[in-house]
Regions:
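N-terminal leader/targeting segments and the immediate start of mature chains
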Residues: 1-53
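Short, solvent-exposed aromatic-acidic interface loops
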Residues: 86-91, 109-116, 185-190, 222-227
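Short beta-strand segments that buttress and anchor functional surface loops
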Residues: 54-61, 82-87, 158-165, 185, ...
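Charge-dense polyanion-binding interfaces
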Residues: 55-66, 237-249
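Gly/Pro-enriched, hydrophobic low-complexity segments
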Residues: 160-248
Length: 249
């Protein structure tokens, strides 16, 4: 795991702080609900970050619910690396999920050295790209880019369409008075162990917090079957997370 830990550090160190700042008056002609979301998420004058480093804790469903702590680095136009630590049967387990430079992978080790799970290939990469798209809500400066196409949806929903390493993503964001309440998208996956296909995936945002001029989701419930709340609660939800720290660069 040492090499992969260095990868997270090197990914973070590869980014230099940018000089451009957020000017709400410079936003293009957008639906009012989109403008309200972006100006709520990013304070006027805040640097337009190209990366964020997150420290988090929560519970993850691996057989049963287990506590974890993790760090994650997200970099615009490159992807993300997520490192987690938890315990199973009293033994330390370390996991890594990544989508970086067009390739996705998952690796979990017991006691640092015994492989528990390895996964990669086209299906994993496509699924990881969907995760990276959804997690743009933790780096909302991504959504200010000129290559994001916004449109208003039904009710309080707005849609952001953009590409993640050439793969189209269509995020649905439920926004009320600028605050994000949920995010969802069709994500490639096989949560039931069957063939990979597009499955509704998303997160409910229960709390937000402000770090360095960015107001981002700080407590979330994440899972599959997002179009069916009962099924989401019963079998789709697999991740509950709280953000402890966010550093933008």
């Amino acid at each position: 795991m040492k090499k992969r830990s260095a990868d997270l550090e090197s990914l973070w160190k590869s980014v230099s702080p940018g000089a451009e700042t957020f000017d709400p008056h410079a936003l293009p002609d957008l639906p009012e609900s989109v403008r309200a979301y972006l100006t709520h998420a990013i304070a006027a004058g805040a640097p337009l970050a190209s990366a964020v480093r997150l420290r988090m804790h929560g519970t993850i469903k691996l057989g049963r619910w287990r506590k974890f702590k993790a760090q994650q680095v997200i970099v615009r136009q490159r992807g993300m690396i997520w490192h987690a630590r938890l315990r199973i049967g009293g033994l330390s387990v370390r996991g890594e999920d990544r989508f970086l430079d067009g390739e996705g992978a998952m690796r979990w080790n017991l006691a640092r050295i015994i492989p528990l799970m390895r996964a990669s290939g086209p299906d994993i990469t496509r699924s990881a790209a969907g995760r990276a798209a959804a997690e743009s809500i933790w780096l909302p400066s991504i959504l200010c880019s000129d290559d994001v196409w916004w449109r208003a949806g039904e009710g309080n929903t707005v849609h952001a369409r953009f590409a993640v390493d050439g793969q189209a993503a269509d995020l649905a964001l439920a926004v009320a008075q600028g605050r994000l309440h949920a995010v969802s998208l069709p994500r490639w996956g096989n949560p039931d162990g069957g063939p990979f296909r597009e499955v509704p995936f998303g997160a409910f945002v229960d709390q937000e917090a402000t770090f360095d001029g960015y107001t981002i989701p700080a407590r979330l419930r994440v899972g599959w079957y997002f179009d069916d709340v009962a099924r989401f609660d019963r079998e789709g939800k697999f991740f509950e997370v709280s953000i402890d720290e966010a550093i933008f660069r």
